[in-house]
Curated annotation (Swiss-Prot):
PROSITE patterns: PGLYCERATE_KINASE. Belongs to the phosphoglycerate kinase family. This is Phosphoglycerate kinase. It is found in: Cytoplasm.
Amino acid sequence: MQKKTLSDISLQGKRVLMRVDFNVPLDQDRNITDEKRIVEALPSIRKVIDNGGRLILMSHLGRPKGKVNPAFSLSPVAKRLSELLDCPVTMAGDCIGTEVMQQVLALQDGDVLMLENLRFHPEEEANDPDFARELASLGEIYVNDAFGTAHRAHASTEGITHFMQTAVAGYLIEKELRYLGTALNDAQRPFVAILGGAKISGKIDVLESLFEKVDTVLVGGAMVFTFFKAQGLDVGNSLVEENKLELAVSLLEKAKAKNVRLLLPEDVVVAGEISADAPSRVEPVSAISAGMIGLDIGPATIETYRKEILDAKTVLWNGPMGVFEIDQFARGTFAVAQALADATAEGAITIIGGGDSAAAIAKAGLSDKVTHVSTGGGASLEFLEGKELPGIAALND
């Protein structure tokens, strides 16, 4: 997907309307608890400022449900951004309207204006054309750098492009497309995908898409128990999607037909309940005790998976191996994170596909030891499923 980017256009003196993803977590006192998304937008923001553009930033934050709610104001973000850039960031009182337009027209080259939360207006998520047109009237150039919302056709990501001639990708989207696109279309082999998470149902399309591309799939997380039950094994009280047993069998057959090795755990960590102080033990998957719940991959599986990861040239990881929020069930997930870091050090391309895996690799302190951590959970999954992302399709080729 070759899209025009920030590097392809002249910015001097132009009003640049940039959609960023500043949907950051805030604590009770409205302090930002994780500023990763703000930091990741800085290269695109600095490019506009340094090239004398007049920057207007827009984002959503949380789910205010189409009503003005001060708890979801972007003002803490504007304040933090101003500190990171070491220059003033003016906070607008809304994202459309006469006052906002006056603030926009008063901007000088290199100035930054932050619009208020787009989702204070129900028209944003409804992709309302009048709202999109009003947003578009604020800028002369549109830049989308919000990969995390690229799979949604909203007014600020898709609708707006119908009213602006110049619509380009920011550096963050460019980087996402480069890494995820390379993984899917031009991967160095062996190509290993690691899929975790609780349910097969959320990963069917990804699995089927990956069967066309990868050499090996390593499966972890609670979804393994649906596969095990489908194979006739006892899984104790582990999570099983009873209505997906036939699907699990067909996925195993599909992998075989495509010559893809699909590896399931050989041992698991089990406990009687999901809690930090529940006594746990390792059991082979062929002998899971009645009443026990599988909550992580076991040491033998960790060893096997580690070896597969270290033999790979391209690795894609989406979804944890167990309940990593609880330390005693986090070993598998952190071992995978470490194996990815080690593979990267040996020259492999390693890509973390957003969501829980991104949180896990951050918790392991290894985010900067892999090639690429995707910023979009749902967006990276849909991209890996081979779906077209509306927010990206809408940009200039």
